[in-house]
Amino acid sequence: MGRVKLKIKRLESTSNRQVTYTKRKNGILKKAKELSILCDIDIVLLMFSPTGRATAFHGEHSCIEEVISKFAQLTPQERTKRKLESLEALKKTFKKLDHDVNIHDFLGARNQTIEGLSNQVAIYQAQLMECHRRLSCWTNIDRIENTEHLDLLEESLRKSIERIQIHKEHYRKNQLLPIECATTQFHSGIQLPMAMGGNSSMQEAHSMSWLPDNDHQQTILPGDSSFLPHREMDGSIPVYSSCFFESTKPEDQICSNPGQQFEQLEQQGNGCLGLQQLGEEYSYPTPFGTTLGMEEDQEKKIKSEMELNNLQQQQQQQQQQQQQDPSMYDPMANNNGGCFQIPHDQSMFVNDHHHHHHHHHQNWVPDSMFGQTSYNQVCVFTPPLELSR
């Protein structure tokens, strides 16, 4: 059975093209090597596989750069002549092999490409000449005596100014876009310190402090002096470390406060430093220093919350001591009317010279007289205990 003759046309299958290239590549490389040795010629063979892999071959005494330079020195006419000679030789070879190949198809494709490139070159040359003509008009305006020509120049100037204004407006909008984004984030309350941008935002981000509350909810506050004032803290609150750290006591050891006042304190104390209330009272400052007038009110509110939290923990400690040693407190003290209230910001000191035992309770309850949360001090006196003789 004879060998099937392959038609000279493009193979549709990718795998078939790769197999055919691999088989015939070795044959053409062998022929090129034999030709360079037998005829002692400068030869360069460069091929790319269907997958894009390059294969290059050159003679023993040949250099690829030298051969390409020699070919580049040929004139276009000489190149076309050599090309036609090669195609005629291929045509004779195909006729002997009974292959139907149209050589003019190869020539036509090449001629169309050259014609297209020639047309593009002509177009570019015409545009270049037009640009030179316009520039020559602007360099010699004093020599122009035609009114129509001057009108054309004026119209060209007007269009150029319009294009410049459009470009300027577009550039200005691109510059204002980051500022508008930052303003939008500020009004929507989304990460204001980061939205302001610049080095100041990074410093504010590093100065953020976390304030835990009794409900174990972490609340973030900026570390600005207008939010956490330390100016009068030592003189107003003796012990304030508990306001910044969570209590390590378990929940089952926290006793509920007896009486109606203690129940109110328990309800208000659990949510006094909640996330929602802090979000309403300690909002982020507006840009350009517009919250300077609100610093005093914020300081008063923060001090009130700190005092309330501090005194609640003192009450819890006293209640635990009462449970451990009930003999130190008289349960009839409250029934005998020994509890009275002292107005806010006033102090009362009672000295007992008859060896009466008294005990001070600093209980803080809301007061509606001041329009905000204020507190009254309650002193509870207990009569002395009779010692057994």
From Swiss-Prot:
GO CC list: nucleus
Coiled-coil ranges per UniProt: 77-131, 293-325
SUPFAM superfamilies: SRF-like (SSF55455)
Tissues expressing the protein: Expressed in pollen.
Pfam families: SRF-TF
Keywords, ordered alphabetically: Coiled coil, DNA-binding, Nucleus, Transcription, Transcription regulation
Entry keyword annotation includes Disulfide bond: no
Annotated region described as Disordered, given as residue ranges: 310-343
One Gene Ontology biological process: pollen maturation
GO-annotated molecular function: cis-regulatory region sequence-specific DNA binding; DNA-binding transcription factor activity; DNA-binding transcription factor activity, RNA polymerase II-specific; protein dimerization activity
Skewed-composition ranges (Low complexity): 312-324
Cell compartments where the protein resides: Nucleus
PROSITE patterns found in the cross-reference section: MADS_BOX_2 (PS50066)
Domain MADS-box: 1-61
Summary of subunit composition and partner proteins: Forms a heterodimer with AGL104.
Stated role: Probable transcription factor that forms a heterodimer with the MADS-box protein AGL104 and is involved in the regulation of pollen maturation at the late stages of pollen development and pollen tube growth.
PANTHER family: SERUM RESPONSE FACTOR HOMOLOG
UniProt protein name: Agamous-like MADS-box protein AGL65
Organism: Arabidopsis thaliana
Chain's gene name: AGL65
